[in-house]
Amino acid sequence: MTRDGRDVADSGRLAAGVRRLRAASPVPLAPLVLALVAAAAAYALSVTVFPYHSSNHDEAVYLQQAAMLLEGQLFLTPPVEDAFRPWFFVDSSAGLYPKYAPVTAAVYALGELAGAFRYALPAVAAATTALLYGVVREAFDHRTGVVAAVALLCSPLFLVQSAVFLPYAPTTMLNLAFAFAYFRAERTGRVAWAAVAGAAVGLAFFSRPYTAVLFAAPFVAHAVWTLAGPVASLREDRTVRPTLRRRVATASLGLVGVAVALSYNAVVTGDPLVFPYEAFAPLDGLGFGTREILDYQRDYTPALALEANARVVWQFVSRWGPFGVVGAPLAVLGAVATARREWRWQQAVLAGVAGSVVVGNVYFWGNLNVLGALADPGDGLIASLGPYYHFDL
């Protein structure tokens, strides 16, 4: 046999081997490979671009909190408190505690248990990529899911946030787990998947309540809309339909997450309705009017909110989203093509998430702070870390 003939034969055997591997594997190879690429990219960026962390001091808070959790502590009790006061920690009679919920810190603590805090970053990036593929596959098909995962890897916001110790990537991972489990529960009718959805959204609420609410709002709307028939059946013949069972499972586990969050508040702040960030800065939160944190104060008017959020969204679509400036037109073309084929309810829910994230963030003054000086696009944390409050987009 000639050398060319042997090369052709070897290529044929390789192709046949790949086909057999695809047939034998219950998981498609493309999303698995993309998840591994995401993990490698996150770790590489974390040790090359951010070896000493980013300019966002919140990273230190989450790493300190992770170290505390590994030691079984919710409070720090230094011998001389005035000489040891970590960034964004609240002073209380029980000791010092961070202004953030412990969910993100727990994720990073798992990385330390595996060998290093940084090991959590590639794990979150891989899980986020795989879950996004799963969500889009449920709503569209395998090919579109792969395209979505590739688009995620082409997003500077995803790459940067996956390489730093901040809460946005881990919370999005939980939100995507909720979406995937919810879609899978509706397709299969299995209550177990509905329970997973509830647990995931409950954890997301514990991590970042407002972020979870904005993401879950379209799903809640769908859940309520589809309950009319099952509730009527329950009133008429006392039968509990599968849809109602799934809704109860999701709501129950989700409310458990809310209860855990409120219980944590009660332990650290003394009031279940006062979150740690409110104890640290009562005017640092949702709403219009006077907003304040540390020595920085602004009158967050609706007009200022709209201007700031318009600038943030523009930064997302022009610089930080998938494929940069061409990403938004491609997304519009995709939406138009989907509309021509008639929207499935899953697709409508995902479109609703984009709307709820954009509109809901207007009510949060953090999108003003991330910009720094409005007239200077190179100012503020958005210049180096992106519009991270819109990470779910």
State each model region's role.
Residues F117-R143, A177, A181:
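Transmembrane-helix motifs of polytopic, lipid-linked glycan transferases
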Residues V213, V359, V370-L393:
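Hydrophobic/aromatic-rich transmembrane helices and adjacent perimembrane loops
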Residues T128, Q315-N361:
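Hydrophobic, aromatic-rich transmembrane alpha-helices
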Residues A16, A185-V191, L214-V258, L262-S263, ...:
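Perimembrane helix-loop-helix junctions
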Residues H57, L157-T171:
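Short acidic/glycine- and proline-prone juxtamembrane loop motifs at membrane-interface regions
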Residues A148-L153, L176, F180, A197, ...:
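Short helix- or helix-capping micro-motifs
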Residues A266, D271-A337, V370-D376:
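Membrane-lumen/periplasm interface segments of multi-pass, membrane-embedded glycan/lipid transferases
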Residues R137-H142, F178-W193, A204, G229:
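Membrane-interface transmembrane helices that cradle and orient dolichyl/undecaprenyl
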